[in-house]
Amino acid sequence: MATVLSGTSGALYYSPAGTTATFGESAVDVANDEIDIATYLNLKVSDPVKFSVVNTETGAAGTGTLPAGITAGTTYYVIGYTASTGVLQVSATLGGSTITITDDGTAVSPNAFQVEYAAPAAVGSVRDWSFEITRSEIDVTTIGQALGQYAPFRSYITGFADGSGSATVYTTDDDTNLSNRMVEDVLQRQQVGATMKLYIDRVVSGGSVDDTLSRSITVPVILTSASLNVNPDDGQSVAINFRPSEAPTFDLTKS
């Protein structure tokens, strides 16, 4: 007999807004071991990032060679990013020195290099989350129908899908909590990279989440509001509202 899950089986993971960008060969500064990516992003020191080659027309994996000194799939850590210029420096270790770049790589259009937040990370002290998806319909009922005994039904075609979500997170004295980042991200103009991973049933094995046994919904989002609640009768909390920016990906089977 199936067992009903409790809310404590769930969890909320998040990739911050403004942490994804594409760049070309000319953006790689070999002399200074820097990369000139987009300006006014939201990359912070110690953010874990990964590099890849993507096809900018399809969004899928592209063809090309990353700059020498950077390995696809390897986690690097931001040691410097200047929003006004877009200059990025990364290290192979947390708090380490900048990597050495010896060649600017190869990426011919429509291919480009991409840097993105390594993976959604756990948001601590989450009270709850909710996510609703809807589908609209367009009324295409026509006149001139033959009338019979029963009232005729309307006819519809598929419209657009949409959704909305929210999460309530308790405020703690830990400045590194991603919930603080989420509040700031609401006002981030470029929210590319913001992603919620909504676990319905999170299974941990060996100290790490086992996604093959867990069930989750991954959805790129736009954060629309943050409402802070401070009063003497309750734990301090912040309510974050969001909407999908792309279609969600459902992983609702344990396999």
Feature-to-residue mapping (PLM):
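Solvent-exposed edge beta-strands and adjacent loop segments
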Residues: A2-A27, Q114-D174, S214-N241, P248
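Autoprocessing Asn-cyclization modules and mimics
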Residues: V4-G7, Y14-Q89, L94-S97
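Generic short beta-strand segments
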Residues: V49-T56, T168-T172, Y199-V203, T224
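Surface-exposed ligand/attachment interfaces on beta-rich extracellular proteins
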Residues: S26-Y40, T58-T71, I101-A107, P120-G124, ...
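Short, acidic/charged, Gly/Pro-enriched secondary-structure junctions
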Residues: Y13, T176-P220
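Extracellular Ig-like/FN3 beta-sandwich strand-entry sites
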Residues: G73, D162, Q191-T195
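Residues on the solvent-exposed faces and adjacent turns
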Residues: V53, G80, A92, V221, ...
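Intrinsically disordered, low-complexity, charged/polar segments
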Residues: A92-P120
